[in-house]
Swiss-Prot record:
It catalyses: L-arginyl-[protein] + NAD(+) = ADP-riboxanated L-argininyl-[protein] + nicotinamide + NH4(+) + H(+). Pfam families: Shigella_OspC. It is an enzyme of class 4 (lyase). The active site is at E268. NAD(+) binds at H85, Q86, S87, L91, I104, N114, F130, H148, F153, D173, E268. ADP-riboxanase effector that mediates arginine ADP-riboxanation of host caspase CASP4/CASP11, thereby inhibiting pyroptosis. Belongs to the OspC family. This is Arginine ADP-riboxanase OspC4. The gene is ospC4. The record marks H85, F130, F153, D173 as: Important for catalytic activity. The keyword Lipid metabolism does not apply. ANK repeats lie at residues 311-340, 355-386, 393-422. It comes from Shigella flexneri.
């Protein structure tokens, strides 16, 4: 029953991706949207078909293989893979739970997002959980990498050593399939110190036969074969003899193999909807800043850092600046904020939000939360008719609401203004 449920959820995620992503339509790899609320398993069959298409495409490019190439391919196919998800959120206790952006939205969870409108429009893979991929037999050395596509996605690394029967692999970030220049790579010094030509060859788009928007996709069963064949294709084209010899070393170790693969590519693995497992490793890579903890709704880190009113001022300013209503309301309930506290917040020199903006501006800017605004005004923490002194000097909160066409805020301010006039 559990396996059937996983398969059904995966089918929904793939149906959404293949039917709604405009990129698949342009590549003639799309799938019609299901007629009912539930997706059939047809979308999983479609994934297998797409994977076979890309395997066939790369086989035609590299066939036949030399003995060195066959040996390298065999090493990759038999390698242990580890999957790394980085976040500033606290995603685990005894169980690791990682949810897709679509799942988070459906549950009205407020947290920092790494999925953007272009991703959703073009590939619609926002119902998947994303992982970097590492090749290593040495659990004690993990993680081997701390960034993905030059980006540090968080201070906590959550590592699993098991794949999903319904996952899919891309050789790069699925949306941004450009491999960056060597100077942006995490382990650049290894390649700059040891090789010459390949450091200039690595920056490129990784794509199929239909141009740079044609991003190869492999199901879990095919992913090692796809990685190996594409790596062989890159090695063949390289003019760097030293790099070629390094890759074809019969005794190459897993860490060196990982260095090669995550230099030539930036592997990304995707699991449908949600990962929930007790088989994982959590590694803290660095400290989490207060602002990052707030953006990630990491209450444990926030409570560790916000131990007095002075730090609460900082935290509240970060919450307002990042439109984190959940954290702002949490802090307001935990600490007894007064109008004097707000005045002290605005004088803080080490908080960019208070340096640039009045608190009233942050409360009423486009996308600000109505409940937070209501709390501040109803508890007398700010004056409804105060004119801004920093950004948009001379304007009021009503002006901000008018610019963003926030009818709920506009009505609230008008009622408050009317009440003020009646008392004069």
């Amino acid at each position: 029953m559990k396996n059937f449920l996983r398969k059904s959820i995966a089918a929904q995620s793939y149906s959404k991706m293949f039917s709604q992503g405009t990129s698949f339509k342009s590549l003639n790899l799309s799938l019609e949207a299901p007629s009912g609320a539930r997706s059939s398993f047809r979308s999983l069959e479609h994934l297998d078909k797409v994977s076979r298409h890309y395997i066939s495409e790369i086989i035609q490019k590299v066939h036949p293989l030399s003995s060195d190439e066959r040996h390298l391919l065999s090493i990759i196919i038999n390698s242990n893979f580890n999957f790394r998800h980085q976040s500033n959120s606290n995603l685990s206790n005894i169980i690791l739970n990682i949810k897709s952006f679509d799942k988070i939205q459906s549950e009205n969870i407020q947290t920092h997002k790494n999925t953007y409108s272009e991703d959703i429009k073009e590939i619609s893979n926002h119902d998947f959980v994303f992982f970097g991929v590492e090749i290593s037999n040495h659990q004690e050395k993990l993680p081997l990498n701390k960034t993905h596509h030059t980006v540090d996605f968080g201070a906590n690394a959550y590592i699993i050593d098991h794949d999903s029967p319904y996952g899919y692999m891309t050789l790069t970030d699925h949306f941004d399939n450009a491999i960056p220049p060597v100077f942006y790579h995490e382990h650049q010094s290894f390649f700059l110190d040891n090789f010459k030509e390949v450091v200039d060859e690595v920056s490129r788009y990784v794509h199929g036969n239909q141009g740079k928007t044609d991003v190869p996709i492999f199901n879990t069963k095919d992913m090692r074969l796809g990685i190996g064949l594409h790596l062989i294709d890159f090695i063949r084209k390289s003019k760097d003899q030293g790099f070629r010899e390094f890759c074809y070393n019969k005794n190459i170790d897993p860490v060196s193999l990982d260095r090669i693969i995550n230099f030539v590519f930036q592997l990304e693995y995707h699991i449908p909807r949600m990962l929930s497992t007790d088989n994982f490793k959590k590694i803290k890579l660095r400290d989490i800043s207060l602002e990052d903890a707030i953006k990630a709704s990491n209450y444990e880190e926030i409570n560790n850092k916000v131990t007095d009113k002075k730090m609460a001022h900082q935290a509240l300013a970060y919450s307002l600046g990042n439109k984190k209503a959940d954290i702002a309301l949490y802090l307001l309930s935990k600490f007894n904020f007064t109008k004097q506290d707000v005045a002290e917040m605005e004088k803080m020199k080490n908080n960019r939000y208070c340096n640039l903006y009045d608190v009233e501006y942050l409360l009423s800017k486009d996308g600000a939360n109505y409940k937070v605004l209501e709390y501040f005004i109803n508890n007398g923490l700010v004056d409804v008719n105060k004119k801004f002194q920093k950004a948009n000097s001379g304007d009021t909160m009503l002006d901000n609401a008018m610019k963003s066409k926030d009818s709920k805020m506009i009505d609230f301010f008008i009622k408050k203004w009317s009440g003020i006039r009646q008392t004069i």
